[in-house]
């Protein structure tokens, strides 16, 4: 094997862990397992507490209508994450580094601020979700739960210090727990299969009904995470694959398989949350359920089993713990890529978590605990508004043959990707128009 075909000794991995070795031969599943991991770290962002809020509200208020939005946004996410992986593997740069190389310093600062805003919005959702889970499980007041969330910097520090594989194993274990909890709740709720299948078909009502559109954009914002595009383009480089063209092509195939499988799991979980909300709340006339606490309180009485509410709270806590790991990694990648500034993981965690906790405490003090439900959904709309500022640079870079070489995307993929970008921009413009003109 020539020098250019040997695996790179260093990988652009945020925690500076040793690259994960990839077997050169043997069964295909050994190579898939070697590449499995980054996709599941990315999938965490698609199952965070923000998704729960929009899915619960959407299912309770509109029944199965928004299942089509979950499906379409998940397919959009699979495409965009595949392009993010392509950028990292083909160029050896993550999205933030590519922006720094190709854009002016002022543009990079603007993009960095937009991405940090998205990370804080995501962190805000995690603080609220984790605080609610602590309240549901242990009776802690929401404000105290939010303050305790600052201490998760220790958890992140321990996990990152263990290396890439233990970190990925922790995340996959919690994802499995979340999936199992909702699989049981789905069985208990006994949804109407015909209505569920009908919900996966797109309906014009999503665009014509302002309430449906608001929740739909929240689902898009909760599903297609802007900071995940930065995260994935870095994490795929944590594998020690040959940096030759043939090696990159194989790595890209395995990376896309990894992320597509992980995002399929996320699709199933998000659909299950909405289906449970629709079949338990909407079907029984409880269309006013707009937050996670209401959902928890009503699950057991309506289903007749205390287990349903317990599983709901456990899965919510697992979701919040998982998300805190990936937002820390994404924050490191973004800050180092755009600004060449690197903070210790615990310092980075305390900084963003501290900023996210303040609005939760303020809203709780001014409007009570009910105000946090609307804050949670609003955070997902903020995420959606930041999406174009991550998606458009990504599409520019993966189309650039000078940067990507033979791995630049073809015309068909380019047209499809830009159609997705235009759809995201169009949804955001429609939302702004609804806000401006009532």
From Swiss-Prot:
Record's bilayer topology term: Multi-pass membrane protein
Residue span of region Disordered: 1-20
A Gene Ontology term for the protein's cellular component: plasma membrane
Organism name: Pseudomonas aeruginosa (strain ATCC 15692 / DSM 22644 / CIP 104116 / JCM 14847 / LMG 12228 / 1C / PRS 101 / PAO1)
Name of the protein described by the UniProt record: Divalent metal cation transporter MntH 2
Biological process per Gene Ontology, one example term: manganese ion transport
Superkingdom of origin organism: Bacteria
Pfam family, one: Nramp
Keyword Membrane on entry: yes
Name of the coding gene: mntH2
